[in-house]
């Protein structure tokens, strides 16, 4: 599920003069390409502007996410984490948690993981991190990241940065042993936030 519309993304090079509406269409096209390359079972694009997802008074995003959760019944939900550097990502996470709390206990997934992309969760003890081994299919990872041309050519080398971050996580995770994986991604277990509304 892609929550926001991509209108406000940074741009340069051939995308420099694209309007926000044009960028929205480019980003949708890229998401559809990624779904084909990755052979996703489904791709849902909510098309919500960032300013709305960050506005806690707007019920529409929560209603949409809730409907998707009820229709798909996931066992694990992967979203952004609450310490994400990107404020839109934090907004998405808050709306996802809100929607999860509206599910009855029987409808809820078994686990909620807040994934980290921008940084390395250095503030967490390693044993508390959710580690996801991304050693396999490195070629597919490169292909998926490479689909997002508007960001890469447009001034943000997410492809190189993401793959480099994964490799660095794998190498720096254990200081006194050899690497156990070729790529690691980190997350935060946020299941308690779904189940305990007092948090």
Predicted regions and their residues:
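Active-site rim/loop-helix segments in enzyme catalytic domains that contact anionic ligands
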Residues: 1-71, 102-105
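Metal-dependent de-N-acetylase/amidase catalytic core
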Residues: 56-199
């Amino acid at each position: 599920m892609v929550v926001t519309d991509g209108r406000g993304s940074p741009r340069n090079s051939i995308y420099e003069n694209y309007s926000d509406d044009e960028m929205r269409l480019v980003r949708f096209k890229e998401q559809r390409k990624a779904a084909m390359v990755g052979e996703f079972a489904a791709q849902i694009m909510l098309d919500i502007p960032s300013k709305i997802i960050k506005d806690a008074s707007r019920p529409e995003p929560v209603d949409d996410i809730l409907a998707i959760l009820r229709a798909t019944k996931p066992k694990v939900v992967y979203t952004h984490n609450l310490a994400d550097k990107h404020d839109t990502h934090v907004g998405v996470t808050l709306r996802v948690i809100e929607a999860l709390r509206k599910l009855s206990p029987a409808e809820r997934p078994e686990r909620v993981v807040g994934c980290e992309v921008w940084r390395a969760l250095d503030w967490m003890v390693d044993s508390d991190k959710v580690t996801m081994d991304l050693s396999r299919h490195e070629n597919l990872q490169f292909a998926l990241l490479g689909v997002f041309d508007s960001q890469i050519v447009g001034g943000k080398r997410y492809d190189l940065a993401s793959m480099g971050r994964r490799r660095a996580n794998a190498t720096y995770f254990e200081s006194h042993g050899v690497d156990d994986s070729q790529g690691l991604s980190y997350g935060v277990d946020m299941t308690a936030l779904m189940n305990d509304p007092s948090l």
